[in-house]
Amino acid sequence: RAAWKEGEKPGSPLSVRAKILTHDSRRYADELYWWEARPEVRLGPPSWHWVERAIESTRQLNAPGILEKITTPILLMATTADRLVDTQRIVRDSKRLPNSELLLFGNEAAHELLREADPVRDMCLDRISRFFEERAPKQ
């Protein structure tokens, strides 16, 4: 299997990368603006150390009883159309978190939910606001 999925490989055409991240070309253009204005914010591919640490942390989270012990309220947001992460895994793990809620989108959303077209982005922002109001009301 290839080490990179289409659009993840460093140097992939920006049009491919854009489609994987968002349906909103203006919000993707914002990323390109910042890459040009502040080149130091542009990230390259992960280091081997990062990959090793990610694998180890995933291994630890997979252990029985670990996610089940987390009692902090957690709002997860994902899309079944995500081409970068395993949405089935997010759904499965959300069921292991005793105090979590999952907002799941379909083909209307790509990976970057808060950089999506307004209907999706607005739903996310609204749900985040309501989540805080419900779970951490102002005193």
Predicted regions mapped to residue ranges:
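Catalytic active-site module of serine/aspartate enzymes centered on a nucleophile-bearing elbow/loop
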Residues: 100-139
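Short beta-strand/loop motif that positions the catalytic acidic residue
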Residues: 70, 76-78, 82
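Active-site nucleophile elbow and catalytic-triad environment of alpha/beta-hydrolase enzymes
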Residues: 46-66
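A generic structural signal for alpha->beta connector loops
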Residues: 71-73, 99-100
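Short alpha-helix in the alpha/beta-hydrolase fold that links the catalytic acid
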Residues: 63, 72, 85-95
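Conserved active-site and cofactor/substrate-binding residues in soluble primary-metabolism enzymes
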Residues: 26, 45, 49, 88, ...
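Alpha/beta-hydrolase-fold enzymes
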Residues: 1-45
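Nucleotide-sugar-dependent glycosyltransferase donor-binding/catalytic pocket residues
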Residues: 83-86, 114
